[in-house]
Each structure stands twice: as structure tokens, then as C-alpha cells.
A protein has these predicted regions:
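A conserved short coil-to-beta-strand element within the FAD-binding core of flavoproteins
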Residues: 288-297
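C-terminal catalytic lobe of FAD-dependent flavoproteins
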Residues: 57-125
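Flavin (FAD/FMN) cofactor-binding and adjacent substrate-gating region
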Residues: 75-94, 166-168, 201-284
């Protein structure tokens, strides 16, 4: 049951219930005698009738939330930049250096698209030696695309999966919490949209248990009618990536908020996905050196 403050552009202005396949519905709690009580929906007064079968979300099974089932608590710091991620080419000491960092809450989501921008910016790489700094999702994705362009790749990293920040990502495919809307430039907007669309298409090739990628409905809950922004909803630049977009009003769904917006997208299991990506990169001939870089030299 994942409930967090969320909106398409302002995560604090509404309630977001993500991961439709794990949606939590009020009314699954323990009795005092230890027996489970499974009434469909319980209102504060306890008088609300069970949900109708035709209501959106009625087929979802509530998860069991029990502190005794928690095996560990972990966290990862998102590399958020209010002006958005950076993909930029520099020349340093006779070498070409391409920056690719700062993806906030959209690292796995944007990984293939942002890596594609970086590889395109690098120019012709076929037959050349290329170094990639970082062994998380962005480094591995960039390494793989470089290989597909004919490069010989060495990855320099202090950690590899499963010990990267990417491994603790939620990895729901949707590029949110990547930038502040009031800092968005036209140049960044172009990169953002291009990266999102490329990545969306690439991930669809990886669906299935081997890569740990599957489709799930996502539900965004709010106290008022769902708001549309620059990214999402009718008129949004990524509207075409919201498969099955539909809004539900009071009485049309089972969730504990007046309004719900649903769309289908991919869910990526980081532990499965990153292990497979690392294996593929290494099988294609990449060298890996465990090493830390302390400065730009």
C-alpha cells in the first residue's frame, strides 16, 4: 500500500496512490481477537455499504500491512536539480566528456532516453575506447548503448548492483519529480520530452520476467477533480504515454478520496532489472573497475 503526497507537477498538492496492483483499500484490518476483518470499505462511521462490482478498483486485493513483515529499512538520495537533469558535452584534456546526471525521481524512468542523448552527443564512437563513470542505472544504460554503437567500454564505479542508489528506487515508469516547473527552459523541455519518449519505447522491449518489467494500473487520488499540467493529462506533452487514462468521480471507485485518475504504465523491479542489465553489459565485453573519483582530474 503506497500512499504519498503527489500530483503530476506538485507532489504535495494531492494524494497519490501508486502501484495499482498493490492498491490499499480501507477495510482490511485485524480484529482484537486476531481474526482478519475484510469488509470492503469502511467509512469513519462504519455505515458505508460494500463496494459495487462495477466500481473501479473493486477487483484489487488489499495488501497485508504488518510491521512484523518488515525485514529492513533503506533509503536513497535522489539527485534532484530544480532546473532538471544535465546532458552536456565538454572537452577536457584532449578528451570528450559528456555529462549525464541529476535525474531526481526519474532516474530509472529516463535512463534509456537520457543515455541516448549522451551517446548521440558523444558523436562517432565505433571502435573507440569509452569510459563510463558510475555503475547505477544511468551508467549501465549508457554503457549498453555505447556498446550497441560499437564502442569498447570500461565502467569505473565505487559500487555495482545490488549496492547502488538505483536499487532502492520505486521504479514506477513515470518521469515525475525531475525539475521545478518554474525553472523549466525550452532547451531542457526538449531534452526531457525526447528522453521520456525514447525511454518509454525502449522499456517496452524489455517486458517480462527476465527483466522484471510489467504493466500495472496506477491510481492518483485527489480531493478535487484531477488537475492537468504541462506533463500529464489532456494537453500534456506526455499525454500519449498515459495508456488508458481515465478519471473517476465520487461513487465511481473504491478508493478513500473523492476523485481518482487511472492510467497504465510499467513497473520495473530494480533488483531483477539491474542484475540483468549488468550481466548483459558484461557479456558484451565491458570491463569494470571498482574505483572512486574524488575530483575532475
Amino acid at each position: 500500500w503506497i500512499v504519498e503526497p503527489c500530483a503530476m507537477m506538485n507532489r504535495r498538492s494531492a494524494i497519490c496512490l501508486a502501484l495499482g496492483g498493490l492498491a490499499g483499500i480501507q477495510g482490511c484490518r485485524k480484529r482484537e481477537d486476531g481474526a482478519a476483518k475484510t469488509d470492503a470499505v469502511i467509512s469513519p462511521a462504519g455505515s458505508e455499504p460494500p463496494a459495487r462490482k462495477d466500481m473501479e478498483g473493486n477487483s484489487l486485493v488489499p495488501v497485508t500491512v504488518d510491521p512484523e513483515q518488515v525485514i529492513r529499512t533503506i533509503g536513497g538520495l535522489r539527485p534532484f536539480r530544480s532546473s532538471g537533469f544535465v546532458v552536456r558535452r565538454d572537452e577536457l584534456g584532449g578528451k570528450t566528456l559528456v555529462h549525464n546526471y541529476g535525474h531526481g525521481g526519474g532516474g530509472i524512468t529516463l535512463s534509456w532516453g537520457s543515455a541516448h542523448l549522451a551517446v548521440e552527443m558523444a558523436g562517432e564512437v565505433s571502435g573507440k575506447e569509452c569510459a563510463v563513470v558510475g555503475g547505477g542505472v544511468m551508467g549501465l544504460s549508457t554503457a549498453r548503448l555505447l556498446q550497441l554503437h560499437g564502442a569498447k567500454v570500461t565502467i569505473y564505479t565505487s559500487d555495482l548492483p545490488p549496492n547502488t542508489t538505483s536499487n532502492v528506487a520505486g521504479a514506477q515508469w513515470w518521469p515525475f519529480s525531475v525539475f521545478d516547473d518554474n525553472r523549466r527552459t525550452d532547451a531542457f523541455a526538449q531534452q526531457y520530452v525526447a528522453a521520456a519518449k525514447y525511454s518509454y519505447e525502449y522499456f517496452q522491449r524489455l517486458g517480462g520476467p527476465r527483466w522484471g518489467v510489467k504493466w500495472l494500473p496506477n491510481y492518483y487520488l485527489s480531493q478535487g477533480p484531477p488537475k492537468n499540467g504541462w506533463i500529464a493529462g489532456p494537453g500534456g506533452v506526455l499525454r500519449d504515454l498515459q495508456v488508458g487514462l481515465h478519471d473517476f468521480g465520487p461513487g465511481e471507485h473504491v478508493f478513500p478520496a473523492p476523485y481518482a485518475r487511472r492510467f497504465h504504465t510499467m513497473m520495473i523491479e530494480p533488483s531483477v532489472y539491474l542484475a540483468e542489465l549488468l550481466a548483459e553489459v558484461q557479456a558484451a565485453g565491458a570491463r569494470v573497475e571498482i574505483r572512486k573519483f574524488v575530483d575532475g582530474n
